[in-house]
Amino acid sequence: MAMATSMSLNLIGAFKGLSLSSTSSFLRGDLSFSPKTSFTVTLPLENLQAPIPLTIESAHKKGAGSTKNGRDSPGQRLGVKIYGDQVAKPGAIIVRQRGTKFHAGKNVGIGKDHTIFSLIDGLVKFEKFGPDRKKISVYPREIVPENPNSYRARKRENFRLQREKKKARRENYSYTLPTPELVLASASVDDAEANPEC
């Protein structure tokens, strides 16, 4: 019995902040170690208060929900910027892409992020490049003189004449259309005698 009390005092001294409940069979002197007996340990509440607030962190990516993160990120603004048969200036970006969906053709360069850009001033053409590839080229623009008899040219001239008439009416003087004058070329009599017709 003396051994049990000294053992309990040693335990109480070792666990200074802990207290064994009075319902414990150990303090009452019951030394039967059966599976039915249980120890209950109570801790004082003032020692349980944490000095800093606790933060709960997940140890694994899955626990943190990384599969749900990053879904609302903005797009990368990829795609075709200048389409076929449109004018491109030197240095103009034609396509921004990941990898080479489009390959570089004539008069275009390719950047380290596979951006295709124009090297000259001209028209952009999208061409087939093999069975399953596409190539982008820029060809110099050939300026074709406009046909003066085309519908667009006649319309432009008609509107120009209307503007001139309206301007003349505002300035209070009559506007007369310039009439085409027939100019006849006449040769002097001396030249006609010197060069007789045969």
Curated annotation (Swiss-Prot):
Q: Which GO terms describe its biological process?
A: translation
Main location group: plastid
Alphabetized PROSITE patterns for the sequence: RIBOSOMAL_L27 (PS00831)
Q: Name one GO molecular function term.
A: mRNA binding
Observed phenotype of the null mutant: Embryonic lethality. Embryo development arrested at the globular stage.
SUPFAM superfamilies assigned: Ribosomal L27 protein-like (SSF110324)
State the oligomer form and interacting partners: Part of the 50S ribosomal subunit.
Q: What is this protein called?
A: Large ribosomal subunit protein bL27c
What is the protein's species of origin? Answer: Arabidopsis thaliana
Q: Which gene encodes it?
A: RPL27
